[in-house]
Amino acid sequence: MVKGTTSMGGFTRKHVHIRCRRCGKNSYHKRHHRCSSCGFPDAKIRKYSWVKWYT
């Protein structure tokens, strides 16, 4: 068993986020079942004044 930086390379193989059905971005978290960009599957779209991509 190896501890430290070398063992962190094992985390790079898995895909945490997949493409979202609503916004199309690669932001849908597979385990949390929620899009970090638009908030899918919430009914209201995720929108904050400090986010610049939709202004």
Swiss-Prot record:
Protein name: Large ribosomal subunit protein eL37
Positions contributing to Zn(2+) binding: C20, C23, C35, C38
Keywords linked to the UniProt accession: Metal-binding, Ribonucleoprotein, Ribosomal protein, RNA-binding, rRNA-binding, Zinc, Zinc-finger
Residue stretches in coiled coil: none
One function term, GO molecular function aspect: structural constituent of ribosome
InterPro entries associated with the record: Ribosomal_eL37, Ribosomal_eL37/eL43, Ribosomal_zn-bd
Required cofactor(s): Zn(2+)
Organism expressing this protein natively: Cenarchaeum symbiosum (strain A)
